[in-house]
């Protein structure tokens, strides 16, 4: 789970400008430009970000979160449990899950380099939703990982709802994990666990 999460979270950086990418579906230069901008921000603030998870979270909030439909993704993860959950529990899960991901894996942002991702030509129908943006992420050891961004939208509004690394879906992976946990302990306990995990990471930490 940890290795998958690391690949997926690094992959989210390729979607820092998905709305522009989604409209053209051939905007390699847009992704490259955005990646370079992000890389510059990290380079100029590296010391600050390295010691302050809250600053990392704010950077993620600004550059990445707006490009993802966390609510729709959370609904897909909870599946049938979303339908039976109260509105309050739905909201709590969306928030807790996002904060858990940032708290647990947010410091991977520090290792992002623009030359580690390559966006492939779009081979689908831009008029149909969902659409897939195919990319290749190069890991530190040189391994190339095929990563697809599954996007839903239309017109000028496209947002990421799932990421698949080598065919392994972020949504399906967490759905399988949480489905077992919910069956044993209930949704409320899962939400509390996510909240506790997110809160257990200090706002200022080097990991």
Where are these regions (language model features)?
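Bacterial N-terminal signal peptides that target proteins for export
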Residues: 1-8
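Short, linear, compositionally biased motifs with a strong N-terminal bias
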Residues: 11-14
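Early exported N-terminus immediately downstream of N-terminal targeting peptides
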Residues: 24-105
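Surface-exposed, polar/charged faces of alpha-helical domains
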Residues: 25, 40, 44-47, 51-55, ...
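Surface-exposed, charged secondary-structure patches
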Residues: 103-145, 197-207
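Short beta-strand edge/turn micro-motifs at domain boundaries
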Residues: 144-172
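Low-complexity, intrinsically disordered terminal/linker segments enriched in charged
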Residues: 162-207
């Amino acid at each position: 789970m940890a290795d998958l999460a690391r690949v997926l979270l690094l992959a989210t950086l390729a979607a820092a400008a998905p709305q522009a990418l989604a409209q053209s579906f051939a905007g390699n230069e847009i992704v490259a430009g955005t990646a370079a901008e992000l890389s510059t921000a990290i380079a100029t603030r590296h010391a600050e970000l390295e010691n302050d998870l809250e600053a990392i979270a704010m950077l993620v909030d600004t550059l990445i979160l707006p490009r993802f439909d966390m609510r729709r993704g959370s609904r897909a993860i909870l599946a049938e449990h979303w339908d039976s959950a109260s509105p309050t529990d739905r909201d709590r899960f969306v928030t807790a899950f996002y904060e858990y991901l940032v708290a647990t894996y947010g410091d991977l942002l520090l290792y992002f380099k623009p030359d580690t991702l390559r966006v492939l030509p779009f081979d689908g129908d831009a008029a149909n939703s969902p659409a897939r943006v195919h990319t290749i992420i190069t890991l530190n050891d040189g391994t190339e990982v095929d990563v697809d961004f599954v996007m839903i939208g239309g017109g000028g509004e496209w947002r990421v709802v799932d990421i698949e690394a080598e065919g392994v879906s972020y949504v399906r992976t967490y759905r399988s994990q949480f489905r077992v946990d919910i069956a044993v302990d209930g949704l409320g306990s899962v939400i509390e666990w996510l909240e506790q995990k997110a809160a257990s990471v200090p706002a200022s930490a080097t990991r």
